[in-house]
Regions:
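Membrane helical hairpin/interfacial module
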Residues: 27-107
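Long, contiguous internal "core" modules enriched in hydrophobic/ aromatic residues
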Residues: 22-27, 41-44, 107-286
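Extramembrane terminal tails and long inter-domain/linker segments of multi-pass membrane proteins
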Residues: 1-12, 47, 86-88, 119-142, ...
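Aromatic-anchored segments of alpha-helical transmembrane domains
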Residues: 160, 231, 298-305
């Protein structure tokens, strides 16, 4: 299989914009999950001055919006997307996802607005002085903020897993119809969120790379990566022990060819092994370049994993 035919084949239904969309959704869910856990375990480090929280403020909703824009304009008839926004079907995975996105965005905006309350009120008083309802809403949220935060954590986990459910719903593709996929995408999303957060921290605090939140993200990152490796192994073992369709799908993906090299060099080599090899050097040097090398490789590996699962998963039809 050539590189051209690897991205264009007869059984292909979803192509590269979907992979980028899944990648961006994972970053948002990962950042929000880490931010909430930071506030629970280290409340003093999870205020409005936190780099992790500020990164979440920008990329939490930003990645979702950008990902949805990619998805909408990739549709054959993008102007019909509004129907999905208001016509719900509990039997459609896509429709359930739209409902989840809407609830996620509403709760995310309220949660972030309360954390950055002083900044929000200052902006409101400067630009929209007559919009006094903003302060009233933020005051009403105060007694329920912790419950709102718990709900936000649940929604972030569901959103991270949903990216895997979306693909596993393609039942005619044995490779994708796998119950491990949602969990794998959840933890790889948290891994990508950790990488983005550490890059942001290194950019903002070049003179102090050992802050409380940086230590917290590092502690979270290590078990998440090992769990990601375990889930990948379990994913492939499940295919190997499955029926004829799953074994054919595994052989097509890892039995040689373009996507086999993509996985071993890109996902495993660049995304998992290289960051582990570079980490001791990055920890000793404590420089921005070290963090960028490790986290950049990890982030690229997560993106390559999305491409691998999406394309290799559509090579074989049941």
């Amino acid at each position: 299989m050539t590189s051209a035919s690897a991205f264009h084949f007869e059984s292909l239904v979803w192509d590269w914009p979907i992979a980028i969309y899944l990648f961006l959704i994972g970053i948002s869910a990962g950042l929000v999950t880490l931010a909430i856990l930071l506030r629970r375990f280290h409340p003093e480090a999870g205020g409005s001055d936190s780099t992790l929280l500020r990164t979440t403020l920008v990329l939490g909703p930003g990645a979702i919006i950008f990902g949805l824009l990619i998805l909408v304009f990739h549709l054959t008839r993008p102007w019909t997307f509004w129907k999905l926004m208001f016509h719900y079907s509990f039997t459609s995975v896509m429709s359930m996802g739209v409902m989840l996105f809407q609830l996620y965005m509403v709760v995310l905006v309220l949660w972030l607005a309360k954390i950055f309350e002083k900044e929000v009120i200052a902006l409101q008083q400067r630009w929209l002085p007559r919009l006094g309802i903003v302060q009233k809403v933020l005051t009403l949220i105060t007694p329920f903020h912790r419950a709102l935060e718990t709900l936000m954590l649940v929604l972030a986990v569901l959103l991270g897993a949903y990216t895997g459910f979306l693909l596993s719903a393609l039942k005619s593709y044995p490779f994708l119809n796998n119950p491990i996929l949602p969990v794998l995408f959840l933890f790889s999303g948290i891994s990508s969120g950790a990488a983005v957060a550490l890059i942001a921290m290194a950019l903002r605090h070049r003179s102090n790379p050992h802050s409380t939140e940086a230590h917290f993200v590092h502690r979270m990152e290590v078990p998440v990566v090992w769990l990601e490796i375990f889930l990948l192994a379990a994913f492939f073992v499940g295919l190997a022990l499955g029926d004829d369709g799953k074994m054919r799908a595994l052989a097509a993906a890892l039995g040689g060819g373009f996507w086999t090299w993509w996985f071993w060099l890109g996902v495993a080599g660049l995304g998992l092994i290289l960051p582990m090899l570079l980490k001791p050097w990055a920890n000793r040097s404590s420089t921005f370049h070290g963090v960028l090398a490790v986290c950049g490789a990890s982030l690229t590996g997560v993106l390559l994993l999305r491409f691998f699962i999406l394309y290799a998963g559509q090579l074989t039809v049941a």
